[in-house]
């Protein structure tokens, strides 16, 4: 029986390789304040964005912390990502010999609404490159933050797209 790679059929190979390259670049430069700390992935509902990203992250040896539309993603929750100095590695890996990095996935980001007050603005502050003196004093994450959404022209998403890779 022949095997067929669905990613080849869907023409995702270039996207996958590009994403892996960006993740590698992030890991090599995460201590720098001038890098973008987030990625925005978008596509039609049900097209497999979340599954694709989760599979790539597992392949790259990441533990994944997911926040989706059913979670509260307001300002205080987003700031918790950095204020409590979230480790670069999972606590469980301390007991194992192989270290696993952490990646934060904000799924259905275009679904952040009034209940998530201040969430988008806090996320922007965490992921944007720190260029000015004021920005350099802001909190940031040593973990990559991947935002997944259905739309790339959405009003709420416009500002965050300016600060992250897509």
Which residues does each PLM region occupy?
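Pre-Walker A (pre-P-loop) alpha-helix and adjacent loop at the N terminus of AAA/AAA+ ATPase modules
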Residues: 2-37, 88-91
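A detector of helix-start/N-cap boundary segments at the beginnings of structured domains
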Residues: 4-9, 41, 65, 166
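Walker A/P-loop
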Residues: 36-67
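Non-catalytic interfacial helical region
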Residues: 68-166
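Pre-Walker A (Motif I) flank of P-loop NTPase domains
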Residues: 33-41, 100, 143
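Beta-strand elements of modular eukaryotic interaction domains
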Residues: 26, 30-31, 55-56, 92-96, ...
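Active-site catalytic pocket residues across diverse enzymes, especially alpha/beta-hydrolases
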Residues: 26, 60, 127-130
């Amino acid at each position: 029986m022949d095997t067929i790679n669905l990613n080849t059929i869907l023409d995702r190979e270039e996207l996958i390789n590009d994403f892996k390259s960006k993740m590698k670049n992030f890991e090599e430069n995460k201590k720098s304040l001038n890098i973008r700390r987030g990625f925005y992935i978008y596509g039609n509902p049900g097209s497999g964005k979340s599954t694709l990203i989760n599979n790539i992250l597992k392949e790259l040896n990441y533990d994944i912390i997911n926040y989706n539309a059913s979670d509260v993603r307001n300002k205080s929750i987003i700031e918790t990502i950095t204020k409590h100095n979230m480790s670069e590695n999972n606590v469980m890996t301390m007991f194992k010999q192989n270290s696993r990095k952490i990646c934060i996935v904000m799924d259905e980001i275009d679904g952040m609404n009034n209940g998530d007050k201040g969430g988008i603005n806090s996320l922007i502050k965490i992921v944007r490159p720190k260029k000015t003196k004021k920005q350099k004093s802001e909190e940031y994450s040593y973990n990559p933050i991947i935002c997944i959404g259905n739309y790339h022209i959405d009003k709420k998403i416009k500002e965050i797209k300016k600060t992250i890779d897509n």
